[in-house]
């Protein structure tokens, strides 16, 4: 088992823009500063602990009894905690400003050292998977203390048919700091550094602020933002195509060596879900496109008084919706009250995120786009990142990410190995938190118009959560299959993506094509997890990663769970 580093299930003086005092992270619970003596101490201890672990256990795993194996597991968890703490600090600090060269260097240096120190541990999963099945079953049936770890090792043993020789696995571990990791970092830094000049706006905007304009009530503002996005993406499309081609080819090579039957296999194993389940969900959702997304967007066109929607109309508010900015204090109260209405303990678990610097909410130049909840390590606490702009969907995103955060806090007592959860299950926790907030808002609606606005927003979020994610899943599967046949041009990528979105949205009669669709590829930024020592990857990575949103939404679907995703 290689070290499983925690991953996020994204100028400190930026203005809150009338939203109230937006919080920023206080990372001192991890380390006080990049040059903190505690960080240097932990790096030295990590190097020593890894070397000692390999010296004590390599070649001996099959001989350990239950007591000896339990001690081995506990030592491995301690190493995971050390490495995870270091990389969590470096990664979170980087995502606050991905365009800062010093932060990027610090992250890369930490990643290089952690990778070097943990290379001796590559033997662990390889040797463990060679233990005979009967001996393995007996070992994990010996007592309750070791039996509780069996689910984690069952997932590890699922990789047994696909593991390579010890030497090749060590090479891949060493090589992980470049290749996909470097390409993902290039993609991240490029996206964070983009600037958009939108006619009518007083200054150039970053990606999050420009995307935010696509949900403005004034149609000319939405159209201007869409054209600005398309123009900037056009100037970068060759780079984005190169990133996608390279990552897809690298994955094809590794899958071929591992003899994985499909590009999706690795992701299904990671998500601990059977391929048949994924295929059944995919087929059911695709069959329902006409009844769901096609129907809804045709209805929305009617509400907006349009014969046909354009791309920039997809996230437009309804005409009767009041335009207002939701301040941070109101967003906090809304989410915490919603959580408390379900269980006071849930609100108690969420409250420290607001009070102790566990949330970074402001939109700033260089800050990574999107939102995430990062578990860090079980002996510290999670951190939540948002790009909060005061829209109703931003409140839902806050509720969603705090659902992750509460789940991560509840899981922490299980320890490093057992606190980690498949992404499909993780998304169930987050959409549950989001749904609590929606149901409370719906219960408080006093007029039919308020209810209509809330329900329409929930339908759109459900389309984004389940239906749209399946369309992206299909696109990723087709992308990887096509890349096996040769290099893909930007036009090849556009055609495949456009076909998937046409099926999803029902371009006729609801939508007209627009050049933004041909460039939508570069916004698919949550599809890989090889990047940054598995901290976060957002270029064209593993098909199936987006499936976790659809699965989470499906589980909560009877209550209308959702995942608010950016356009």
What positions do the PLM features span?
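A well-structured
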Residues: 1-321
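C-terminal, non-catalytic "cap/extension" segments appended to globular domains
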Residues: 18-21, 28, 34, 124, ...
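Long, K/E/R/D-enriched contiguous segments that form extended
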Residues: 301-338, 384, 407, 459-465, ...
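Acidic/histidine-rich catalytic neighborhood
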Residues: 316-318, 333, 415-481
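Catalytic zinc-binding patch centered on the HExxH motif and its immediate surroundings
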Residues: 324-326, 359-381
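Short pre-active-site segment immediately N-terminal to the catalytic Zn-binding motif
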Residues: 324-328, 379-399
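Amphipathic alpha-helical domain-onset/packing element
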Residues: 328-358
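Catalytic Zn2+-binding segment of zinc metalloproteases
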Residues: 403-417
């Amino acid at each position: 088992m290689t070290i499983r580093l925690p991953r996020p299930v994204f100028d400190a003086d930026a203005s809150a823009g009338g939203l109230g005092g937006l919080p920023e992270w206080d990372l001192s619970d991890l380390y006080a500063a990049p040059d903190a003596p505690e960080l240097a101490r932990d790096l030295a201890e990590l190097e020593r602990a890894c070397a000692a672990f390999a010296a004590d256990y390599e070649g001996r795993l099959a001989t350990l009894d239950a007591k000896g194996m339990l001690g081995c597991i506990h030592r491995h968890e301690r190493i995971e905690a050390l490495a995870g703490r270091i990389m969590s600090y470096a990664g979170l600090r980087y995502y606050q400003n991905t365009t800062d060269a010093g932060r990027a260097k610090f992250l890369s240096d930490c990643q290089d050292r952690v990778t070097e120190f943990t290379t001796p541990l590559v033997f662990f999963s390889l040797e463990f998977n060679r233990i005979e099945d009967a001996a393995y079953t007996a070992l994990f049936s010996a007592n309750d203390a070791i039996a509780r770890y069996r689910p984690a090792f069952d997932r590890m043993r699922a990789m047994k048919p696909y593991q390579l020789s010890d030497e090749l696995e060590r090479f891949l571990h060493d090589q992980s700091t470049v290749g996909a990791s470097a390409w993902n970092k290039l993609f991240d830094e490029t996206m964070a550094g983009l600037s958009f000049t939108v006619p009518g706006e007083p200054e150039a905007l970053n990606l999050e602020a420009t995307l935010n304009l696509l949900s403005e009530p004034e149609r000319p503002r939405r159209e201007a933002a869409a054209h600005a996005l398309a123009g900037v993406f056009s100037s970068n499309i060759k780079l984005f195509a190169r990133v996608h081609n390279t990552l897809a080819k690298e994955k094809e090579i590794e899958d071929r060596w591992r003899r994985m039957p499909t590009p999706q296999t690795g992701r299904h194993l990671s998500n601990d879900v059977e391929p048949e389940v994924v295929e059944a969900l995919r087929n059911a959702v695709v069959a329902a496109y006409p009844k769901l997304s096609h129907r809804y967007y045709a209805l929305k066109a009617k509400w907006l008084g349009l014969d046909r929607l354009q791309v920039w109309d997809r996230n437009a508010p309804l005409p009767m919706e009041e335009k207002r900015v939701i301040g941070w204090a109101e967003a906090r109260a809304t989410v915490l009250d919603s959580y408390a209405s379900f269980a006071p303990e849930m609100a108690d678990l969420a409250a420290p995120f607001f009070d102790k610097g566990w949330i970074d909410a402001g939109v700033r130049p260089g800050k990574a786009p999107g939102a995430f909840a990062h578990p860090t390590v079980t002996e510290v606490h999670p951190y939540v990142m948002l790009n909060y702009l005061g829209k109703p969907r931003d409140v839902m995103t806050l509720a969603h990410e705090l659902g992750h955060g509460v789940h991560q806090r509840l899981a922490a007592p299980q320890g490093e190995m057992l606190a980690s959860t498949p992404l499909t299950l993780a998304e169930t926790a987050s959409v549950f938190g989001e749904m609590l907030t929606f149901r409370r808002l719906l219960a408080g609606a006093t007029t039919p118009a308020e209810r209509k606005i809330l329900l329409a927003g929930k339908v759109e979020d459900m389309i984004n959560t389940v239906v749209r994610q399946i369309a992206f899943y299909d696109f990723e599967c087709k992308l990887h299959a096509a890349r096996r046949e040769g290099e893909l041009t930007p036009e090849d990528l556009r055609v495949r993506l456009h076909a998937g979105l046409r099926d999803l949205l029902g371009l006729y009669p609801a939508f007209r094509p627009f050049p933004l669709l041909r460039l939508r590829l570069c916004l698919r930024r949550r599809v890989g997890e090889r990047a940054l020592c598995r901290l976060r990857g957002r270029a064209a990575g593993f098909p199936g990663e987006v499936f976790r949103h659809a699965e989470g939404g499906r589980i909560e679907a009877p209550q209308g769970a959702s995942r608010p995703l950016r356009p």
